[in-house]
Amino acid sequence: NAVSKMCTSGSVPGVSFLLCNTDAQALHHSPVEDKITIGPTVTKGLGAGAKPERAREAALESKEAIREALTSGETRMVFITAGMGGGTGTGAAPVIGKIAMEAGLLTIGIVTIPFLFEGTAKILQALEGVKQMRESVDALLVINNQRLIEVYKNFTVSEAFSKADDTLSNAARGISDLVNITGTINLDFADVDTTLRNGGVAVINTGYAEGPERMTLAIQEALNSPLLNNNNISKARQLLINVYESSEAPMTVSELTELQTFTEDFSDKVKTIYGTAPRQRSEEHTSELQ
C-alpha cells in the first residue's frame, strides 16, 4: 500500500517502483506498472500461505528476474519495504536484499513489525524476519505498528496507517531530495553511500520547524518519529545532516551553533557529513538527519 501510494502521488521524484509478490491477484490490482509475480511454480500465484520458507523459495525461483529488474537502467540504490510476520514479506524480502547487495547496489530495508494483538507466533516470526533483513541489507529501518495504537489512538484506522506510510515515504523522499537538489554545501549520492553502506540499523527522517530556535526544533522532530523502533542515535557511527533553508529566512551563523551543539553530544569517532540546500517546497525550514 505504501509503495502504491508513493507511486500514484508522485511525492518521490527520481524514484522508480517495483512490486514483488507471490499473490498474482494482489499485483493485478496495484497501480504500480512494474511488477513481478515471484515463484510461479512454487506458489502458483496464490500467495505464500503465511509461510516465510515458501516465500523464500519463491524469491529464489525468480532470482534472475528480480536481479534484471533491479539492475536495469541507472539504479544505484534500492529501498526494500516489507511487512514482517507474514509469509511473503518475511521470507522474500531478505532474498531480494541479498540480490541487490550482490549487484553492488546500496540497499536499504524499511520493514514493519506487527501489532501485539496479532499474536506471539506472528511477532516472533516477524522478529526472525528482521534479523534476516539486518544480514541482507546495508541499513535497516524498523517501523513498529504497535506504536500506531499508542500514538494515534484517536485516529481512524486508515489515518493511522497513513502515518506509517508517511514514515516510509519521508525516508525515500529525503534521500531523493538530497541526491537531486543542488545545495550551497552540496551533498550527493557518494555521501549517502558513505553513510549508509554497511550501516546496520538506521534512522532516516525529516524535521520541519520555523521561527525562533527552528534548527533545534527541526532536529528534535527528525529524531522523534514515534513509529521508528530504533530512534536512539546516541551510538551512531555516521551522521548525514542536510539543512534546507527558506529564501525568505536564510540560515544564520547562530543557527550553525545550534547544529554544533547537537553534534557535540556524539563521540569524537562519529563521522559527520553536513550540507545545506535551498528549500524547494513550501516549508519554512527543513532539517534532515540520517
Regions found by a protein language model. Give the residues of each.
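Tubulin/FtsZ superfamily GTPase core signature
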Residues: 1-290
